[in-house]
Amino acid sequence: MGKYDRYISFKNANWESQSSGVMDGLKPHIEAADSPFWVYFMRQRELAHQRGLDDLRVLHNFLPTLRELLEELDDQPTLALLEQLEESCM
């Protein structure tokens, strides 16, 4: 992977794959539906996709809440993916 500067371009940032990885990590929590937040999150994701927005935008919009929930759930792998995505692409 080439070097990039996130403030200039997402070229070589692999943001689509990183976003997909975070969404894959969230999937078990969404399916468990232990929090009403997940229903709201998925509805907002659906609306964002209808407006042509991608998962990077959705994840960015909910970053603090997702971080807090992942910490509470002690999901360190998904939290690490989210933090990597934030650092490299947000």
UniProtKB/Swiss-Prot annotation:
Disulfide bridges in this chain: none
A single BP term in Gene Ontology: nitrogen fixation
Pfam families noted in UniProt: CowN (PF20543)
Keyword tags: Nitrogen fixation
UniProt family annotation: Belongs to the CowN family.
Described function: Is required to sustain N(2)-dependent growth in the presence of low levels of carbon monoxide (CO). Probably acts by protecting the N(2) fixation ability of the nitrogenase complex, which is inactivated in the presence of CO.
Name recorded for this polypeptide: N(2)-fixation sustaining protein CowN
